[in-house]
Structure formats: structure tokens, C-alpha cells
Regions:
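Long, contiguous binding/interaction regions
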Residues: 1-83
């Protein structure tokens, strides 16, 4: 199955959701290339770069999207499949 490169931006409005967000990211550690957090007073931003199959990426973003108090946006690069 083809692997794709992409990124996800996670906006955490409810800091109580942070442990659940971290658990989801840990479960998908095998596709995560880079993770960077930007803590602010009222919210937190997390940027993640990943490489995985569309199924793996869908699992990651789907699980994140079901967490209350966060917003998730993802993007995949077109035509940059990896072996």
C-alpha cells in the first residue's frame, strides 16, 4: 500500500483533553516523523508531520476528531508517495 506524507494541526481548546490527545498520538507513533507543541495561556497548538498509508492517516485523524475540546485539520501532499 502506498505511503503518503502529510501534516495535521491540532487546536486544543480544553487542556483536559491533552492526555487523550497524547494517547492517540502515542498509538500512532510509528507514522509520526515530527511533533511540535505551542502552549499558550488559553489554548495549545500541536503540529504533527507524518508518513503513512491513507488507512493509518485516517485512523489518526479520525480518533483525534472524536475528542471533545479540540479541532483538527490535516493535509496530504499530492504525488509524493513513498515506498
Amino acid at each position: 500500500m502506498e505511503r503518503r506524507i502529510g501534516s495535521v494541526l491540532i487546536y486544543v481548546d480544553n487542556r483536559e483533553a491533552a492526555p487523550e490527545v497524547n494517547a492517540v498520538l502515542s498509538r500512532h507513533a510509528d507514522i509520526i516523523i515530527c511533533r511540535q507543541g505551542f502552549p499558550r495561556r488559553q489554548y495549545c497548538l500541536i503540529s504533527v508531520i507524518f508518513e503513512g498509508t491513507t488507512d493509518e492517516i485516517g485512523s489518526l485523524t479520525g480518533q483525534l476528531g472524536r475528542i471533545n475540546g479540540i479541532e483538527v485539520k490535516s493535509a496530504l501532499l499530492k504525488g509524493h508517495e513513498t515506498a
